[in-house]
Amino acid sequence: MTVIAQPGADVRVRTLSSEDEFTELADVWDDLVLAMTRPSPFLLHTWLREWWRHYANDGQLAIHVAYRGDRLVGALPLSVRRRHGLRITEFIGGWALLADVLIARGEDESVVAGALAERASTMDHDFADLYGLTGASRLVAALPPADFRLIERLEAPILELSSGWEAVSQSKLSPKARSMRRRRRRQLEAVGPVEVALARTREELAPALEEAFRVHALRWQGRNDSSEFATPVGKAFHRAALLRLADDDAVRLLTLSVNGKPIAFALSVQLADRAYGLRRAFDPAFGRFSPGSEAKLLSLEAAAAEGMERSEFLGAAAPHNVRFADTFDPICQGIGLARTPRGRVAVAALLAGIRIRRTLKRSATARRLYARARRLKGTRA
């Protein structure tokens, strides 16, 4: 364990390099997460620990923790992994959405964030690639702008639920959409008995999760799936993490079944009056009934009934999410803090690659819109 003194702030920073050291913080870690303006379930101690157990491989923990006296007042959960011969600093979790420096309530954010940011900027790495930050990140604010570039990657739509589901559904679903939903439900019921189940306890969740893996595999069969939800390691990780979180009543898995067979699910994690969408899928054999949309709506209704004030979709601005969005709070990728010549070259190449992909994506979108406009013009003519 490394101890580094921070001058003048009465804050000392340690770097934890072993899982055992991190495990010792289990009782106090989540208080830091709950103190976040936008609490991330992907920074909860259980989630991070299980992710590391399943995905560590040859990575090295570098969890920076800040103390004032004996009190834990801040943390920055990082790890260093080797990719393409480079030592790259990442958040534990890799895709730990909404990740940031953690700061205890009542602390001077500039002092704690500054101490942790200073430690991160002097790590033994080539560069840092931190995915999951937000535009309001306290870590980013504490880093020199010239050393760290923040790039928006996901639009992250948010739906406000505080007015109750009846009001939300009336405002978000047109009369035509509500009529279509009822019609498709009747069509589905003509196939066989329709059941809706909401798993939340460990005993309920264990079998429901296996069905979710099956449905997810059907949905993504033959397609590029980067979610890790259905890989052998991914399934083992989600079983371990979600079942442990279920002991804290934080998981909700809504399943839609026909003839006793699940055909769609919506999986979410609840934290601090917010529901965070984790995964949704449906059996494409039933696609004409829109079971994925129905499972999503039922999941949102259940969250509102429990008193959740907002639902975070955490993804891109896809049409099925945008139609429900009240606002957007984008998720970003932070790249920089290069410490070596190779790191500086890698940062420049990575940023250039992102710019090129964005340009190509915009160009492809523009071409599709132009082609569609031409078709519509021809139809009107």
Predicted feature locations:
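Residues forming anionic-ligand binding surfaces in small-molecule and nucleic-acid pockets
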Residues: 90-97
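The substrate-binding groove and active-site-proximal loops of carbohydrate-active enzymes
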Residues: 99-104
